[in-house]
């Protein structure tokens, strides 16, 4: 039977082999999965357009980061938004290599990549390229959140382009292994970048007791990773008699001195992101969902 989708990028994937039906375990529909593959193929086409190893501009780097981040689990289930991102990537490629689209003798060197080539590749090649792809997708989440706070690293941005180029290129196991190892190396730099962004913006985290009790009165729950979104909400609700509670992976926010100074950041509600539907079902409060903990 023909697969409606194929996705195995998260640890919850069906049967530890891959989600192939009409929807994934995360709730992602097959049409969304196909659009994410199309977006990834467009990003590889953009990397091909700059030949992978050339120095890229800040603008191109940010588009690549945003595009990769869009394909991360629980970031976006909005098909219209994904299609818009695909067009943004294609427009950037057209800006960089305008003659390719009108070339009378196309060489194919800047073509978009068909992700079915990867999913149906030799097992070892598929495994190594998937390690690279899923590694840079996760890294893109760190880079994106750092960028939101106006922190960036040119070496990190450049590696996203290099890695995408390698995924779309016919490579041997021996030639792919150094890139796999470099994913880990650059990921450490990217984690350091995000840590620098968070600590220089919100202070160095310190041990903090966090209550799990919800007080009487109006409140808002915030789930996800985006500290900037939480900051904006705290500033907009200050002095209005509305308490704020974190959920899931937003728990560490309570440890940052800048954020904990808001007295209406009261505590933490619930458990992990995958329990949202059960925990939020009868919650008498609005919920602010931030990336990357969205569930449809």
Residue ranges and their predicted role:
Residues 2-296:
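Metallocofactor- and cofactor-centric catalytic cores in central/energy metabolism, strongly enriched
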């Amino acid at each position: 039977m023909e697969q409606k989708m194929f996705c195995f990028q998260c640890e919850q994937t069906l049967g530890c082999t891959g989600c192939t039906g009409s929807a994934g375990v995360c709730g992602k529909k097959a049409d969304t999965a196909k659009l994410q593959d199309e977006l990834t193929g467009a990003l590889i086409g953009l990397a091909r357009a700059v030949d992978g190893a050339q120095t890229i501009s800040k603008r191109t780097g940010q588009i690549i980061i945003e595009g990769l981040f869009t394909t991360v689990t629980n970031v976006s289930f909005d098909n219209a938004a994904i299609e818009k991102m695909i067009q943004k990537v294609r427009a950037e490629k057209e800006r960089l290599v305008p003659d390719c689209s009108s070339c009378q003798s196309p060489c194919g060197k800047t073509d978009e990549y068909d992700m079915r080539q990867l999913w149906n590749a030799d097992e070892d090649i598929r495994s190594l390229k998937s390690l690279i792809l899923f590694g840079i997708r996760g890294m893109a989440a760190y880079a994106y959140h750092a960028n939101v706070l106006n922190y960036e690293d040119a070496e990190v941005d450049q590696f996203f382009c290099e890695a995408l180029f390698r995924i779309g290129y016919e490579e041997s196991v021996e030639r792919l292994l150094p890139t796999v190892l470099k994913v880990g190396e650059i990921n450490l730099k990217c984690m350091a970048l995000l840590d620098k962004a968070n600590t220089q913006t919100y202070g160095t985290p310190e041990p903090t007791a966090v209550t799990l009790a919800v007080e009487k009165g109006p409140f808002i729950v915030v789930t996800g990773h985006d500290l900037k979104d939480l900051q904006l909400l705290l500033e907009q609700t200050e002095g209005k008699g509305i308490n704020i509670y974190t959920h899931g992976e937003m728990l560490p926010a309570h440890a940052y001195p800048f954020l904990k100074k808001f007295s209406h950041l009261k505590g933490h509600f619930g458990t992990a992101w995958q329990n949202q539907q059960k925990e939020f079902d009868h919650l008498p409060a609005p919920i602010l969902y931030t990336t990357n903990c969205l569930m449809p």
